Amino acid sequence: MLTATGIRAVIGKGGMDQATLDAMKQYGCVYLAIVGGCSAVYTPAAKLVDDYWPELMPVDNQRLKFELNEFGPLFVAMDANGNSVYAQCIDNAQKNRPAIYQTLGIKE
């Protein structure tokens, strides 16, 4: 998709897999994460321009094109250097889990 469209930024709320992160690094694309609970802020700033493949259901499989005006707040969750805050969070949780379990008296 990145090579066919030339997309430089994707907006979402949950990240993408490692293969997509690798492709984003290769083509200089970033993943911008929306902040949960801000739909009242985001909605007025987005105007639907096109609906690609509207027959695809569920809606999360559709590809929509929006015109954005003063759209935010956003943060770079996956960058064009191959870094991912999602992967970092998982790594930190796994690294700290033994100590947390020990503190709470939970056996692994």
Predicted regions and their residues:
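Feature captures the catalytic cores and cofactor-binding loops of soluble hydro-lyases/lyases
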Residues: 1-71
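C-terminal binding/interaction regions
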Residues: 44-108
